[in-house]
Amino acid sequence: MRDISDTIARLSAMRGRPAGAGQSKDDHLSEMTGFGSNPGALRARFYLPENLPKQAALVVVLHGCTQNAAAYDHGSGWTELAAEQGFAVLLPEQQRANNANLCFNWFVPGDVSRDSGEALSIRQMIEAAVVTHGLDRKRIFVTGLSAGGAMAAVMLATYPDVFAGGAIIAGLAYGSASTIPEAFDRMRGHGGPSRSDLQRLLREASPHKGAWPRISVWQGSADTTVVPSNADAVLAQWQGVHGLAQAPTRTEKVDGQGRKVWCDGKGRDVVEAYSIAGMGHGTPLQASGDNALGKAGPFMLDVGISSTRHIARFWGLTKPDVRRAAKAEAASGTALQPFSPKEKPRAVRVDPAPEPVNPPSGPAGGITKVIEDALRAAGLMR
């Protein structure tokens, strides 16, 4: 744990972020309703390209804090790539009633357990999309940025039987935090579970005994919001279940950036990690040139490499020279079939007690107000 002055500084910095930085008016996504009990109270957006092939793949895309589904899609280019290559995209969206800063609640115990909270809501959306549109259950993938990357880690840990692969961009390892102070400390690289505990947390998150998803990890070397040691923790967690050594099988340069690859006993690439030199907090893009995809903006960083294209290729979703002539437009949906597992009760979220009529004056009262104001602005307190 850091001292109180460090905590106040971090909270105050989050309070200064523009509320609408990640919002977008360019929205061609469709709405998904009636997908289940939705215990996490999330919104579901989706996109189907024209002439979608039978048994198409599904990519689940999770936005970061201060963003919404349309804004993250506009920046990352996932539906643009889906139109080009022929797969479906599901974009869960956080609501302000759950989190004032629109962060997925990646460390709240009631939201990150199998069959409860936000994790179950996303699972229900996936089931509804697969059943309604005849998608391929063997080709379901999940990716996300920051809090969305941490939530992607949650989904991969709690439902490894659902996903063929995942990609975590500037995210955090599953189970690395369960409280607000722990979340801030992990983001800054302070403390956290040991390598063996990270691997144990992953194994205990589900009853899964089969093959594990392939994992792609992306991190900016100059990220001070979610520091690079978090990528190391994610890698350590997944190296365990895949039976991999800490040292990579090979290292190489891709579009001028460092890539490490870990292969399984059959020689298949099962874990990869990109370190983007000099990049801060955000999703790496190539917004110009022959392979341009996405648009630069807040937390969407044009650094000359498209994480979206490379992730899709790692999953086997794309072929470099195959492009469909399609335009990203709204897709019309049909009635959705609810998914109803044995749902675990979600802990009631308790609002903070009202402030006293005469709050304490002096330094202590001032510190309390700064902390509470910043927590609310950061989406960590209601």
Where are these regions (language model features)?
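Short beta-strand/loop motif that positions the catalytic acidic residue
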Residues: V217-Q219, D223
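Conserved alpha/beta-hydrolase "acid-adjacent" motif
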Residues: T225-N230, P284-L285
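Short substrate-entry loop that stabilizes the transition state in hydrolases
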Residues: L52-A100, S176
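A domain-start/cap signature at the N-terminus of enzymes
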Residues: M1-L58, A70-S76, E84, R137, ...
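The conserved beta1-alpha1 loop
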Residues: V60-T66, A170, Q219, A277
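Cap/lid segment of the alpha/beta-hydrolase catalytic domain
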Residues: E93-G117, I180
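Primarily recognizes the serine-hydrolase "nucleophile elbow" in alpha/beta-hydrolase
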Residues: V130-T132, D136-G210, T224
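Alpha/beta-hydrolase active-site loop
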Residues: G110-H133, V154
